[in-house]
């Protein structure tokens, strides 16, 4: 994977790569770390001031209220300086078919002008609205095709699912899928740059 990694780590113009993610149970974090390893990019974890409950219905009701009211969660820690990057990967678990609200906060607060954004997500159900909403919420970004990876489902009862252990069992399969996806979007990125004269 040296060719794909080096191409994203030092894309045309000498830009850098940033891998941003939010993860509750480790599923999305594991994928993010694999992308970071393959691209040689920097890693940034989105963290919230508020801790989300596992118990249902609160686990679903709180994010739903955040989306409907626009009162998105406050993030903890300093934001990365996105201006120094050319390519930004953004990872999220699927919450109610779409981007998790902590990731929505990050997207709201960042201007991606001149940046290329590629999304990835982990799901236990249906991520049908992820790519549409990522595109709509990534201000001024050039969006590449997203990729989805199956994750664990938390019922809110019993032990919390270990997403990292679940993904570790599938590491070879995930690695092959990531390789194919990175090659595909790299070709898309280079083609777009050539078409736009950049």
Question: Language-model features: where?
Answer:
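FMN-binding flavodoxin-like domain, especially the glycine-rich phosphate-binding loop
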Residues: 3-18, 23-48, 62, 67-198
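Glycine-rich phosphate-binding loop and adjoining beta1-alpha1-beta2 segment
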Residues: 48-56
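FAD-dinucleotide binding site
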Residues: 57-61
């Amino acid at each position: 994977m040296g060719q794909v990694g080096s191409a994203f780590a030092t894309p045309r113009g000498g830009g850098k790569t940033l891998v941003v993610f939010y993860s509750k149970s480790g599923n999305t974090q594991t994928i993010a770390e694999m992308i970071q390893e393959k691209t040689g990019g920097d890693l940034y974890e989105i963290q919230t001031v508020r801790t989300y409950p596992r118990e249902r219905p609160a686990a679903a009701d709180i994010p739903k209220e955040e989306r409907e009211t626009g009162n998105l969660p406050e993030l903890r820690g300093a934001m990365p300086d996105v201006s120094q990057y050319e390519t930004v990967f953004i990872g999220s678990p699927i919450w109610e078919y779409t981007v998790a609200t902590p990731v929505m906060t990050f997207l709201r607060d960042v201007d991606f002008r001149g940046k290329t954004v590629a999304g990835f997500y982990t799901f236990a159900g249906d991520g049908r609205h992820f790519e549409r909403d990522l595109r709509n919420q990534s201000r001024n970004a050039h969006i590449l095709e997203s990729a989805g990876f199956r994750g664990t489902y938390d019922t809110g009862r019993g032990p919390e699912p270990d997403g990292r252990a679940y993904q570790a069992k599938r590491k070879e399969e995930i690695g092959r899928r990531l390789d194919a996806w990175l090659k595909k979007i790299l070709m898309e990125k280079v083609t777009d740059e050539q078409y736009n004269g950049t």
